Amino acid sequence: MPKVGMQPIRRQQLIEATMAAVNEVGMHEASIAQIAKRAGVSNGIISHYFRDKNGLLEATMRYLIRHLGEAVKQHLAALSVNDPRARLRAIAEGNFDDSQINSAAMKTWLAFWASSMHSPQLYRLQQVNNRRLYSNLCAEFKRCLPREQAQLAAKGMAGLIDGLWLRSALSGEHFNRQEALLIIHNYIEQQLNIKYKC
């Protein structure tokens, strides 16, 4: 019989072990046995909590998405002004939070993106994540721009966030957060200063 209160601890151990395995050997090479060994549990524990490797990957992605949402909320909550520019910058800062740009997280995100093209559950998670980013950006741009301009600006900024992140992940180099934020901040200024004063 499992110990009471162990489920959240075990699940967290397995998620962290999954990210470590993906970081070291990649998603395809990260076997159930290898992940279980890293977590210090039996293979059966993974089946008990997650059904299979796909269930574990889905739980790991939910974990990363939850941390991404929390990072964005924290950056927004830290603002002393309710200014669209500041809020757009905070959204970018949350997307480039340390929880999202460390090696294990970046490689797990890459594996997730690749797997989401072939898994309906992962595809749905990816779409929810994409819509949340777009919606947050669009809401802020709409405070300064007409609807169509705001939608285009939000799509462009989401593309920049994803593109900067992806280029860094594929380069194998450490993510240059300061440089990425400078590029995003310049984009925000260009969008808000073209025709509209905000």
Curated annotation (Swiss-Prot):
Entry keywords, A to Z: DNA-binding, Repressor, Transcription, Transcription regulation
Domain of life assignment: Bacteria
SUPFAM superfamilies, per the entry: Homeodomain-like (SSF46689), Tetracyclin repressor-like, C-terminal domain (SSF48498)
Gene3D superfamilies cross-referenced by the UniProt entry: Tetracycline Repressor, domain 2
UniProt keyword annotation of Transcription regulation present: yes
InterPro entries found in the cross-reference section: BetI_C, DNA-bd_HTH_TetR-type_CS, Homeodomain-like_sf, HTH-type_TetR-like_transc_reg, HTH_TetR, Tet_transcr_reg_TetR-rel_C_sf, Tscrpt_rep_BetI
Gene Ontology molecular function: any one: DNA-binding transcription factor activity
All copies of domain HTH tetR-type, residue ranges: 8-68
One annotated GO biological process: glycine betaine biosynthetic process from choline
Annotated metabolic or biological route of this protein: Amine and polyamine biosynthesis; betaine biosynthesis via choline pathway [regulation]
DNA-binding region of this protein: 31-50
Keyword presence, DNA-binding: yes
Pfam families: TetR_C_6, TetR_N
NCBIfam families from the UniProt entry: betaine_BetI, PRK00767.1
Function text: Repressor involved in the biosynthesis of the osmoprotectant glycine betaine. It represses transcription of the choline transporter BetT and the genes of BetAB involved in the synthesis of glycine betaine.
Name the UniProt record assigns to this protein: HTH-type transcriptional regulator BetI
Organism phylogeny: Bacteria, Pseudomonadati, Pseudomonadota, Gammaproteobacteria, Enterobacterales
Primary gene name: betI
